[in-house]
């Protein structure tokens, strides 16, 4: 019997291939004590805000390269506007952009392209941190 906590992970990118790459790299169970994951895909910034406002999302993985609304701006917006926001991870294509991730107040970064060796560990760590403070159902 597993004591793993199920979690809902929102993945945002304007590009379907990036959303698929994140889901594939992380999988349904990123660690023995984390998951299974339910994936929610969003293709627009408006969808992300609406979904997070609906409650029940544990983690958002946001593509910093998305157009027209980038994941870094969305992370900043969610931090400012949502008191009990989910954990936030932004995907960045260039390491020099890590300062932008810091500005956005994201909890973690992952490089693009997504590395299937590191992505599950980053996601699992973020979700473990959430266990004691589950999102408020609205």
Annotated model-derived regions:
Residues 58-79:
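Conserved phosphotransfer microenvironments
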Residues 93-109:
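Alpha4 helix (beta4-alpha4-beta5 surface) of REC/receiver domains from two-component response regulators
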């Amino acid at each position: 019997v597993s004591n793993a906590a199920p979690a809902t992970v929102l993945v945002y990118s304007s590009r379907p291939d990036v959303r698929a790459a994140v889901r594939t790299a992380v999988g349904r169970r990123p660690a023995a004590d984390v998951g299974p994951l339910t994936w929610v895909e969003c293709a627009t910034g408006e969808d992300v805000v609406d979904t997070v406002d609906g409650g029940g999302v544990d983690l958002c993985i946001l593509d910093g390269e998305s157009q027209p609304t980038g994941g870094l701006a969305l992370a900043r917006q969610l931090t400012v506007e949502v008191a009990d926001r989910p954990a936030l991870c932004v995907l960045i294509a260039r390491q020099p952009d890590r300062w932008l991730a810091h500005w956005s107040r994201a909890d973690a970064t992952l490089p693009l392209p997504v590395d299937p060796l590191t992505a599950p560990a980053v996601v699992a760590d973020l979700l473990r941190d959430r266990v004691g403070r589950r999102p408020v159902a609205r």
